């Protein structure tokens, strides 16, 4: 996966399949695993840095669970650090935990984390100011490119150094680099606490970008996509400061369906997010290489995919939430074949 991340940084455009993060169950299932490796996805994102932008794929026949959502809500997720780059441990006896930073100059800073009188769990997380600044600039630029308001939220009232640094950097970069352009476009940058942001999102109409720290973005992108219809109906692209675009399906490996497939059982797996990951990468490649035919192919495939669903031919997950009354539930292979037929018309 480290090699994959480095290759991606050289190729500019890449498409990533879902990956497996080993846990105890996976270690038993795949004996070839030598250790409980960290998230492959997190490893790639740490190498590439940047921001993950996720937006729902909307169709007329599937309405959001939140009735007042009329436009897409794009989640901008910081792709580096926090819990995904953390270290943790479990201790069994009374004692104390400290955190020490040792500078190259030899200067040390030590903080007491906590004293405990019994078993405890500990976690140390970090982020880099350089990465936070890249995250902020990516979000502001994406807001300008798409002409949408930008929201950002943390818990700076509790995390007065960690989260407050995120808040301060966003505000500094906005005022010094982007404020005038935002005013020209009539769009707004808005900061609030993460709990207030969640409440506001539920009452909003959509049509904005919601910038989140790494963990918040992981959780909220799933919530937003599910409320709009399905996690399989969401685009996802990692944009790095070096100009790398990594397209992916927003969901994971669809484990339950995979096990059914191994048993020879029929599945009805929604492949829309995977299709849009490929079309997104192909379109961006076409834009960079000035290949309008490639861009047109991507557009045509996306339209054929959505037209197939609107015609009533879809996978089981969409059949459960569509407003259409005349629906044909297709299995995984037949859904892809139906899209091909639509495209060939």
Q: For each predicted feature, which ranges?
A:
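Flexible, glycine/charged-enriched surface loops at secondary-structure junctions
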Residues: 146-154, 178-191, 286-298, 308-320
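Short acidic loop-to-helix transition motifs that present clustered carboxylates
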Residues: 192-199
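Glycine-rich phosphate/nucleotide-binding loop
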Residues: 201-300, 304-311
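Phosphate-binding loop/pocket of nucleotide- and phosphate-handling active sites
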Residues: 316, 320-345
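Single conserved hydrophobic/aromatic residue that forms the stacking wall/gate
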Residues: 1-8, 13
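Glycine-rich phosphate/diphosphate-binding loop of Rossmann-like nucleotide-binding domains
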Residues: 99-192
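Flexible glycine-/small-residue-enriched beta->alpha junction loops
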Residues: 18-22, 30-120
